[in-house]
Amino acid sequence: MSLPDSPLQLIGILFLLSILPLIIVMGTSFLKLAVVFSILRNALGIQQVPPNIALYGLALVLSLFIMGPTLLAVKERWHPVQVAGAPFWTSEWDSKALAPYRQFLQKNSEEKEANYFRNLIKRTWPEDIKRKIKPDSLLILIPAFTVSQLTQAFRIGLLIYLPFLAIDLLISNILLAMGMMMVSPMTISLPFKLLIFLLAGGWDLTLAQLVQSFS
């Protein structure tokens, strides 16, 4: 069936393309990676290096690497039924093809967040609608996954930030003891932070831990 002969499919494809950036940010590992990289850059004290486009590009590449098995599993299960006049997002296609993606969301979401959104649905949604929502619905899993990823990103960011904060405080105290109060501690501490980060294999450790943090 060609696209001009199936306007519903064309509308569906255009709609998915329009929300694709939102799906990538909120429904994949991209959010956690981007937040951690931004915190790491701020902790090092280099506000504009690497630029945002480089950080987001690295986060996107790593997201493709992390999501690769899930995407391949979805592709293998994607066997849409061609029904005349029916859109391609049928419930049968959804239940079969998106099972690996649901498993990814469940494994990387905190159970308390999922339960929070389930209880929120019970308290706020109309009775006739909430009865149709399954416990593993994407309407529950995606928000729970997003909040869980933000929480984990802030935890990792805190662990990254503390050592560099200690270096800043140490340099600041040394400068005060030497009477060099007019010298910016950030200017002196930046080379030391970069040196320690490189000697410790900071990029390898950070990327390895981030990738391994996903089930």
From Swiss-Prot:
Gene Ontology cellular component annotations, sorted alphabetically: plasma membrane
Induction annotation: Repressed by methyl-3,4-dephostatin.
Highest taxon in the source lineage: Bacteria
An individual GO BP term: protein secretion
Membrane topology recorded in Swiss-Prot or TrEMBL: Multi-pass membrane protein
Alphabetized UniProt keyword annotations: Cell membrane, Membrane, Transmembrane, Transmembrane helix, Virulence
Membrane-crossing segments per the record: 10-30, 53-73, 156-176, 188-208
Pfam families the UniProt entry points to: FliP (PF00813)
InterPro entries according to UniProt: T3SS_IM_P (IPR005838), T3SS_YscR-like (IPR005773)
Cellular localization per UniProt: Cell membrane
Family: Belongs to the FliP/MopC/SpaP family.
NCBIfam families: PRK12797.1 (NF009438), yscR (TIGR01102)
Protein name: Virulence protein YscR
Organism: Salmonella typhimurium (strain LT2 / SGSC1412 / ATCC 700720)
Species classification: Bacteria, Pseudomonadati, Pseudomonadota, Gammaproteobacteria, Enterobacterales
Gene: yscR
